[in-house]
């Protein structure tokens, strides 16, 4: 591919796109490089994006649930650790762990003592056998010297084993003392935790009793206020109805008086008409006009009387309803008064007498009953408070004796 004519040569370079080399007539090379570029990212369709999101939803849900569970577990563990630290369970658990470790060390020391004792006993047995043989051998025999030397070595070994045994016993005693101290510390921590729990339970019970007393006092006060409101309404009701009845009765009496005067005038006109007989037409027309005016006035008075009568009927119905309500109120008040004055409860089914409504005795009875209810509510509150205080004071010595014995 060499020569004077232009030739195109394709050369392959590692990691580089193909290079086109052109050789000219003068021998110079002109390099032309063709670069290859990747196509741009294609835009995703909305359907594809939605489908991908749908496929990723389960994984997102699992990740979210795992995160929520992890956070909930960490939060619960943190609060539980705080509770254990507040109550003292951490100290008790740590003391129990120390007891377990001390027990393990003590058991190891006991094993060493057992091994040392067994070795010492075996050595003493061997020494006894050697001494028995030495006693049976004559002093002139050559074996006597060997047995004496063996006895000497065994005595030295026995001394070493005895020292090791004594050291093991001392170590066992030390480990046992540490184990006993750990057990005492654990018992002390457990007793402290129990006392702390009892104290907090006592404080909680006292606070609960105080909250109960305060709640009962508040409820009694609210009920007393409601009873006061009902009594005030009951007191206002008869007074307003009595005023309305008085006004309607006065207007009715005035209407009756006007009607009687009108009737008297009519009678006088009739008698005058009969006495005069037949008269002039002018006089007859004047009397006719007077009669028409009087008839219109009479009709108006009759219509007004009917309205007044209907109003009085309505007021009478309201008064009957109020009497029933007052009788029910009186029954309720008598039932409320029954615990304070037993044996004085009478029938309350009947309606109240009209003299109470006329002379205002119902209002006085209601006010008196209001005072009695207020005094009874105050007595109940004071008695409940005294009972709670006495119970607390009576419980204190028992709790002190219980804590002292424990």
Curated annotation (Swiss-Prot):
Chemical reaction(s) catalysed: K(+)(in) = K(+)(out)
* InterPro entries found in the cross-reference section: CCDC51
Q: Where are the transmembrane segments?
A: 199-219, 383-403
Q: How does this protein lie in the membrane?
A: Multi-pass membrane protein
Q: Which GO terms describe its molecular function?
A: mitochondrial ATP-gated potassium channel activity
User: What controls its activity?
Assistant: Inhibited by ATP via mitoK(ATP) channel.
Q: What happens when the gene is disrupted?
A: Knockout mice exhibit no visible phenotype. Mutant mice are slightly more sensitive to the ischaemia-reperfusion protocol.
The name on file for this protein is: Mitochondrial potassium channel
List the PANTHER family: COILED-COIL DOMAIN-CONTAINING PROTEIN 51 (PTHR28624), MITOCHONDRIAL POTASSIUM CHANNEL (PTHR28624:SF1)
* Species of provenance: Mus musculus
Q: Biological process GO annotation list?
A: cell volume homeostasis; mitochondrial potassium ion transmembrane transport; potassium ion transmembrane transport
Show the transit peptide stretch. 1-35
Query: How the protein assembles, per its UniProt entry?
Result: The mitochondrial potassium channel (mitoK(ATP)) is composed of 4 subunits of CCDC51/MITOK and 4 subunits of ABCB8/MITOSUR.
Keywords attached to this Swiss-Prot or TrEMBL record, sorted alphabetically, are: Coiled coil, Ion channel, Ion transport, Membrane, Mitochondrion, Mitochondrion inner membrane, Potassium, Potassium channel, Potassium transport, Transit peptide, Transmembrane, Transmembrane helix, Transport
Q: Acetylation: is it a keyword of this entry?
A: no
Q: Give the Mitochondrial intermembrane compartment stretches of this protein.
A: 220-382
Answer whether the UniProt record assigns the keyword RNA-binding to this protein: no
Domain of life according to the entry: Eukaryota
The record describes the protein's role as: Pore-forming subunit of the mitochondrial ATP-gated potassium channel (mitoK(ATP)). Together with ATP-binding subunit ABCB8/MITOSUR of the mitoK(ATP) channel, mediates ATP-dependent K(+) currents across the mitochondrial inner membrane. An increase in ATP intracellular levels closes the channel, inhibiting K(+) transport, whereas a decrease in ATP levels enhances K(+) uptake in the mitochondrial matrix. May contribute to the homeostatic control of cellular metabolism under stress conditions by regulating the mitochondrial matrix volume.
- Which residue stretches are annotated as topological domain Mitochondrial matrix? 36-198, 404-406
Q: Where would you find this protein in the cell? A: Mitochondrion inner membrane
Listed GO CC annotations: mitochondrial ATP-gated potassium channel complex; mitochondrial inner membrane; mitochondrion; potassium channel complex
